[in-house]
């Protein structure tokens, strides 16, 4: 039953983000696309921060008064279900459906997985694979690097991942909101931040520099993520930009599947190898972006 519930939860979660991104693409103009995707990304990161805090506050609490042994462990899941129900109601009531009605004589263009979109998806896979790789080894890296016990490891990992999410929110609500240029430039701006963050982590003599390295990676991700989704939508025609975003959202799924798998293999060889491994990926990113710009 637990396995089935996790499958259902993952299926809903995997569908909600592409659908939300596609909606943002459909209701924003080309000039507002990066800004809209930045707000969308910031909302996701706020949830990333508040979710663990909410779970920690609710676990063990039997706020429903049920006479069931260990029912308090299920409280976060019940509250999550209620929140999702409220979100669904909010969507149906308050979000306008601005779907364009096409005449029967006007053929609707279909989203095509052309060379440009293939390059874009490749860019997304690299970005999210590298990010997922770092996320998945953070706890192990902290524990092995500083010889922390389990409690200190959990607390420090929460601080680092929370800082990454917070810095992503900062860049998405400040830099991205004011930026009006090409979305690909946001990805290019993020690459030096990614490279710098990896070097800071690899050569950090203490926890402080490691902390700033993770924060810098969060800033980079706050630029790269909306830049990627905006570029994907602007790659399509006006009547299928939402579909393009939905298709482009396959990249985070692949990245968060491949990243943790690679991290285990690399980390078993050396604790710094995952960070060394992703450095060439960022240079590959530069090459792909350059090819995409030549096509455009």
Located regions from the model:
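Hydrophobic core of transmembrane alpha-helices in multi-pass small-molecule transporters
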Residues: 1-15, 209-223
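Cytoplasmic helix-loop-helix junction between adjacent transmembrane helices
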Residues: 5-44
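C-terminal membrane-cytosol helix-exit motif in multi-pass small-molecule transporters
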Residues: 81-101, 286-292
């Amino acid at each position: 039953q637990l396995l089935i519930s996790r499958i259902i939860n993952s299926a809903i979660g995997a569908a909600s983000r592409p659908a939300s991104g596609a909606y943002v693409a459909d209701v924003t103009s080309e000039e507002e696309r990066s800004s809209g995707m930045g707000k969308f990304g910031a909302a996701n990161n706020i949830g990333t921060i508040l979710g663990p805090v909410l779970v920690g506050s609710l676990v063990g609490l039997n706020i429903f008064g049920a006479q069931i042994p260990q029912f308090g462990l299920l409280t976060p899941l019940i509250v999550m279900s209620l929140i999702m129900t409220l979100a669904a109601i909010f969507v149906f009531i308050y979000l306008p459906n601005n779907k364009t009605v096409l005449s029967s004589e006007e053929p609707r263009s279909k989203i095509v997985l052309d060379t440009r979109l293939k390059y874009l998806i490749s860019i997304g896979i690299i970005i999210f694979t590298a990010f997922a790789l770092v996320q998945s080894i953070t706890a192990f890296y902290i524990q092995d690097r500083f010889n922390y016990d389990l409690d200190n490891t959990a607390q420090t990992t929460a601080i680092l991942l929370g800082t990454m999410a917070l810095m992503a929110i900062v860049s998405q609500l400040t830099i991205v909101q004011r930026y009006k240029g090409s979305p690909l430039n946001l990805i290019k701006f993020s690459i030096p931040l990614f490279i710098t963050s990896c070097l800071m982590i690899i050569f950090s003599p203490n926890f402080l520099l490691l902390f700033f390295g993770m924060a810098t990676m969060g800033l980079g991700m706050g630029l790269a993520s909306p830049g990627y989704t905006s570029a994907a939508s602007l790659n399509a025609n006006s009547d299928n930009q939402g579909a393009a975003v939905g298709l482009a959202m396959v990249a985070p799924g692949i990245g968060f599947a491949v990243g943790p798998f690679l991290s285990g293999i690399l980390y078993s060889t050396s604790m710094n190898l995952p960070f060394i491994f992703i450095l060439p990926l960022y240079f590959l990113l530069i090459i792909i972006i350059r090819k995409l710009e030549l096509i455009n």
